[in-house]
């Protein structure tokens, strides 16, 4: 089943999504309130959520880049890779949508970032590693990351403009 992309868009950080009794009903209410098509099927609801999360990631990503430039006027390079760790790194659709929306390469993994960090801290306490750079190198050499490259730039740029209008 194919579901239309960007048919319905929400701001995932809207307070109405903090702890609703029904997330589906909250999404539908938001779409009604913003005069959008109301997602009805599970596929439409999932697509709304994934599209909206990726577009929100782009917005926050742009804010962070702007903040970095404002703090360091000599900062000339843009962030060109976004790392997603933890359980979210397993969601291939959201990771691809995130790459598409942000326009940067997404590297997904490791899934168990917290556990690996804990292991590395224990290794440091035992004198087996000397610093964070060595820890990062060990993890990088031990874990296969999945790389997602941006696609469909024009489509996602248009969707982002729609997102900004809806979420103002």
Regions found by a protein language model. Give the residues of each.
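Intrinsic-disorder-associated, low-complexity terminal segments enriched in Asp/Asn/His/Tyr and depleted
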Residues: 72-74
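Active-site core segments that coordinate phosphate-bearing ligands/cofactors
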Residues: 1-69, 79-81, 90-114, 120-151, ...
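Glycine- and other small-residue-rich loops at beta-strand/loop junctions that grip anionic moieties
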Residues: 87
């Amino acid at each position: 089943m194919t579901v239309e992309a960007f048919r319905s868009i929400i701001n995932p950080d809207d307070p109405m999504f903090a702890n609703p009794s029904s997330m589906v009903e909250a999404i539908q209410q938001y779409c009604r309130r913003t005069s959008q098509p109301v997602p009805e099927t599970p596929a439409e609801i999932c697509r709304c959520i994934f599209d909206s999360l990726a577009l929100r990631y782009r917005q926050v990503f742009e804010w962070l880049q702007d903040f970095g430039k404002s703090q360091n006027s000599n900062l000339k390079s843009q962030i060109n890779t976004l790392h997603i760790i933890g359980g979210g790194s397993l969601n291939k659709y959201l990771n691809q949508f995130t790459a598409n929306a942000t326009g940067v390469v997404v590297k997904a993994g490791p899934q168990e970032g917290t556990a690996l960090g804990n292991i590395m801290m224990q290794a440091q306490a035992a004198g087996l590693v000397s610093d964070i750079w060595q820890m990062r190198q060990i993890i990088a050499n031990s874990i296969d990351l999945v790389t997602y490259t941006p696609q469909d730039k024009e489509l996602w740029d248009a969707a982002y403009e729609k997102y900004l209008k809806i979420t103002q």
